[in-house]
């Protein structure tokens, strides 16, 4: 019974993903974007408005409406430009972006990772990890880490910022709207607390 239920759920989930547009198990992109949201100069299969469910290689920069699987890039993955929902691993020397990462997104880049809306997973880079508007559940590690809404997990960097925090922030400057967890840093801010700033170690519950 459990096996039958699992199969039914898997089929329904796959049908939901594939119903959002055409898809391919393999994708490839050649070229760079001239400007954000401008696909001139990019030769890509499948097209940006379609999806890849499996493996995509970008010999420059790539973007798809949905990208589920492994996405290595020679330059960057820019799925947010196609409002793409990403599930899986993005790896690029420059940057990775995604429209959403609710399926579970893992971003590893040299400089910058961004999810425009809510996400689960981890972001690892040198300079800035950002979840712009929604929640983030997972790990962020870079010089700067930012979550626009609720955060559950761990942020490690010089500057960490989020909405309601459940978890841990480790850095020089930590900033949260509310705290149910731990902040370790030179300055720790909780804007909805009577004592907004507290040094070194701060515990909230």
List the model feature ranges, each with a label.
Residues 1-4:
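Positively charged n-region of N-terminal signal peptides that target proteins for export
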Residues 10-18:
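Hydrophobic h-region of N-terminal signal peptides that target proteins for export
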Residues 20-205:
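Surface-exposed, glycine- and small/polar-enriched segments that build interaction surfaces at terminal
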């Amino acid at each position: 019974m459990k096996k039958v239920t699992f199969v039914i759920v898997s089929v329904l989930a796959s049908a939901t993903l594939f119903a959002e547009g055409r898809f391919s198990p393999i994708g490839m992109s050649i070229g760079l974007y001239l400007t954000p949201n401008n696909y001139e100069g990019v030769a890509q299969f499948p097209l940006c408005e379609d999806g890849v469910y499996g493996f995509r290689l970008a010999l420059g920069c790539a973007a798809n409406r949905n990208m589920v699987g492994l996405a290595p890039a020679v330059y960057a993955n820019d799925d947010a430009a196609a409002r793409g929902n990403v599930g899986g691993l993005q790896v690029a020397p420059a940057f990775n972006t995604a429209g959403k990462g609710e399926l579970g997104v893992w971003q590893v880049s040299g400089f910058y990772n961004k999810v425009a809306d809510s996400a689960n997973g981890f972001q690892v880079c040198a300079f800035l990890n950002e979840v712009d508007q929604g929640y983030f559940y997972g790990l962020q590690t870079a010089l700067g880490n930012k979550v626009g809404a609720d955060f559950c997990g761990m942020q490690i960097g010089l500057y960490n910022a989020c909405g309601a925090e459940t978890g841990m922030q480790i850095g020089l400057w930590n900033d949260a709207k509310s705290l149910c967890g731990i902040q370790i840093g030179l300055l720790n801010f909780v804007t909805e607390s009577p004592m907004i700033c507290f040094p070194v170690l701060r515990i909230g519950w």
